[in-house]
Regions:
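Bacterial N-terminal signal peptides
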Residues: 7-16
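N-terminal, active-site-proximal structural segment of metallo-dependent hydrolase catalytic domains
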Residues: 18-130, 141-146, 151, 319-321, ...
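Metal-dependent phosphoester-hydrolase catalytic domains
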Residues: 19-23, 30, 225-237, 244-350
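Active-site beta-strand/loop signature of hydrolases that rely on acidic residues for catalysis
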Residues: 31-36, 80-86, 90, 101-124, ...
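Short, solvent-exposed loop/turn and secondary-structure capping segments
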Residues: 42-47, 125-129, 152, 166-169, ...
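Extracytoplasmic, non-cytosolic globular domains
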Residues: 48-50, 113, 131, 140-144, ...
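Structured beta-strand-rich core segments of catalytic domains in phosphoester-bond hydrolases
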Residues: 112-198
Length: 350
């Protein structure tokens, strides 16, 4: 009798299980963009103008002083002559960058980080292995570009790569040839999402605001051409320092013309956020740093931005001045982190 009852119970449980709909598996991926402001080692890279970021002991020869004296901007000239970029200062810089990254996702850090102003793969790998070891990031992605100072765009990721990264030069008008040495390419990297599909990402650092607006327009157009070349059924993001100030956007309608027609813009979803960068000279905030999102397939998209997930990651003590603005990394004390705050968003499968 007991065996009969057990058999009936097993049959009923099996039938009940079959009648229940399968439980949906939801995956999420957190993306950060972070301009880490001059993350240099203190070794002179051949072919790059990185003389600012050397120890003071290596800045005493006449050749170095003569090169610095030729710099027209006084603050840049003083930086070239007087910054003492020691091992201890580099260690402090790496430490505070890591703290800013690890404040996200309960100390794990984001799954993907688009980085700007990284000198080379060596300093990126030092950040990853010595200061972000707990985050379990894979070897960094950085391809040396044409910026004469040597600052590059890069990625750190826990997601496996789904192809060979590529660095795309921005196509400028010939009238800007003399300025190309102060520009960075667009780094494309494809990632394998948890459900096995491919996510394409671009890490960008557009021409600085002191360059003509037309150079940033050229950068947006290059990015959008790269977007069109990707499969329509692939989710895509672009993250970085777009260097479009709030004043320029207001005057030239930059985001409405070159971004919103194709992308969802992170700052449109960041409730109550003033910006990621502050310019004290005219007391203005800007979202220089953005994450742009292009889901695939319209309403049938399997990956979407999670509601209310966009945030400014500025919660570490070192990141903020008493007045509530970004605290750039300053010498000689090594206070601050960067003149940019990281922007974070989460995408999830449905």
């Amino acid at each position: 009798m007991n065996q009969l009852r057990l058999a009936l119970l097993a049959t009923m449980l099996a039938a009940a299980a079959c009648s229940q709909p399968p439980v949906a598996t939801t995956h999420s991926v957190t993306i950060m963009t972070f301009n880490v402001e001059n993350l240099f080692d203190n070794i002179d890279d051949p072919g790059k103008d990185d003389r600012d970021y050397l120890p003071l002991s290596q800045k005493q020869d006449p050749e170095h002083k003569a090169a610095c004296a030729a710099v027209e901007v006084e603050s840049w000239r003083n930086r070239c002559l007087n910054i003492d970029w020691t091992d201890a200062i580099i260690a402090k810089k790496l430490e505070v960058i890591a703290q800013a990254i690890l404040q996200v996702d309960g100390g794990r850090g984001p799954d993907i980080i688009a980085l700007q102003e990284v000198e080379n793969i060596a300093i990126l790998e030092r950040l990853r292995t010595e200061y972000l070891a707990a985050a379990n990031y894979l070897p960094g992605v950085l391809i040396e570009g044409r910026d004469t100072r040597g600052i590059d765009v890069a990625f750190l990721t826990r997601l496996p790569l789904a192809g060979e990264p590529q660095l795309h030069d921005i196509v400028f008008d010939e009238s800007f040839n003399a300025r190309e040495g102060d520009t960075r390419g667009i780094l494309q990297t494809d990632f394998q999402l948890p459900d096995g599909s491919v996510l394409s990402g671009f890490s960008v650092h557009f021409p600085a605001p002191y360059h003509p607006t037309e150079m940033r327009i050229a950068a947006y157009r290059t990015l959008n051409r790269l977007l069109v070349e990707l499969p329509e059924d692939r989710p895509v993001f672009a993250a970085g320092d777009f260097n479009t100030t709030s004043m320029e956007d207001s005057a030239r309608d930059m985001l409405n013309r070159f971004v919103r027609p194709d992308w969802t813009v992170s700052n449109d979803l960041c409730v109550g956020c003033q910006g990621s960068s502050y310019y004290a000279a005219d007391d203005t905030w800007s979202f220089l740093d953005m994450i742009l999102w292009r889901p695939c397939c319209g309403e049938d998209a399997t990956w979407q931005v999670r509601a209310d997930s966009v945030q400014i990651a500025n919660g570490t003590k070192a990141q903020m001045l008493p007045g509530g603005t970004p605290r750039r990394f300053s010498l000689p004390d090594g206070n601050g982190v960067s003149d940019h705050w990281p922007v974070v968003l989460t995408i999830e499968s449905k």
